[in-house]
Curated annotation (Swiss-Prot):
Domain GIY-YIG: 16-94
Protein name as annotated: UvrABC system protein C
Main subcellular localisation: cytoplasm
Pfam annotation, one family: UvrC_RNaseH
Cytoplasm keyword on record: yes
Sequence similarity: Belongs to the UvrC family.
Name of the gene: uvrC
Amino acid sequence: MSEIFDAKAFLKTVTSQPGVYRMYDAGGTVIYVGKAKDLKKRLSSYFRSNLASRKTEALVAQIQHIDVTVTHTETEALLLEHNYIKLYQPRYNVLLRDDKSYPFIFLSGDTHPRLAMHRGAKHAKGEYFGPFPNGYAVRETLALLQKIFPIRQCENSVYRNRSRPCLQYQIGRCLGPCVAGLVSEEEYAQQVEYVRLFLSGKDDQVLTQLIARMEKASQDLAFEEAARIRDQIQAVRRVTERQFVSNAGDDLDVIGVAFDAGMACVHVLFIRQGKVLGSRSYFPKVPGGTELGEVVETFVGQFYLQGSQMRTLPGEILLDFNLSDKTLLADSLSELAGRRIHVQTKPRGDRARYLKLARTNAATALITKLSQQSTITQRLTALAAVLKLPAIKRMECFDISHTMGEQTVASCVVFDANGPLRAEYRRYNIAGITPGDDYAAMNQVLRRRYGKAIEESKIPDVILIDGGKGQLAQAKAVFAELDVPWDKHRPLLLGVAKGADRKAGLETLFFEPEGEGFSLPPDSPALHVIQHIRDESHDHAIGGHRKKRAKVKNTSTLETIEGVGPKRRQMLLKYMGGLQGLRNASVEEIAKVPGISQGLAEKIFWSLKH
């Protein structure tokens, strides 16, 4: 117990009402957040002679100060607890690492509705279907829908400025509502209704309506129309046959848990209208000595209560673990949703199968994660030994990419003890240097990255510079001049020069710009982690450079035409659906673009042709 913190005096001031407490260490950092139905009773339990676990002992030993917030109800306390956990990220709480919002499929409320992926608050008028486990699942579904039900997926800015149909219409993946006369209002509305029913899980209704339309078309001797509808029916059937569907139109989340070697995996299975939309595995940060029950309870609370504004709550949540606050959680979620949410822990029938599936996926994902963790831990330990460091908790690597000195982009990738930390990857557009001067580019990106105060936890132990002696010299010069509050002896700078023929395994490493470097054996775990972070940095830089180059390519041709400034370039590209559409347009079509005269249209036409 802390010698500074007077627990007896503090407990005399604590009420027996429900509320939330925050525990602080000597540095004023929140180290734990908790809730209680009875604050006095709960806080008193921390200062008994026999504590429940080593984790609690370690926590209490660091307490310098406790803040208490009284609430009217337990539900308020539960919501406030998870808001505080998200705000402070206390090291003794179980923390949900990934709290980004889930993507939905959005069907807009426009005259001619469009389909799109949506994340975030649901302000736009229209319908939202989901949630889906990730953006990939949404994009796959949108691509599938485009083949079966060809309604538009273009932005409104493109749709409103079309004068003729785009490529999607030509290949049969859009009905072309942007151009009058290509599709009737009734036909487009019918396809939109099919999409609505399909995304709502009402496949049978879609098939029934399509079959009726096909039969009518056959009776009317409209055989081409009947054949088109037949193909649509077959496509819908192929999709529905591949889906795992329950007998009832279940709308639920299924949560399976696995726990081993101090690491937990929580696998969430998303089921809407009886169909498995997908799933995602989470690996919450678990303080040492934490019981599995606390992991599950905290995860479920954070998962639903912290992200409630961005997440559609299902009617039912299935768990394979009993929660002490199950009723409180269900009541809190019901209050947020404005309808009854059920939390079940002992399902039967199909629900038991779902739970077994989630549990199996959690165990499989945990085995994979532990294997990866073991590999990256071994590699970082080996590299620390090579570099004579006690440990490596964070590494950053830089690379430069350009084409003949144009569109230069620098990348910074970050590894921590668990491997790539992709949320902290960054790209930097480099400007104001001589084209092709990689040294100046490296100098600029390092100053932008490190020429300011950095949180202690984000100061890297090692910085890898891809490029050998010259680039390392730039890095050394930058760090010698930087006026930053942290120690100039940290981080360690390491240059990496590619081997002969740029073959992996032949890299030369440099601690200093002068003198000879050294190499590691091709089978060295230390070399493997260097190659991994170097390749990540290289790929990240190239990806950014290609995006920048593609953007410039779309406008560079127009930039040479007198009278076509940035606003007109943007209008031309939007109205024509891109540079290729503009190249294929006639003078008359170009002249219809707002702000383009007949004379300027002719100039643009001939400039693009020649």
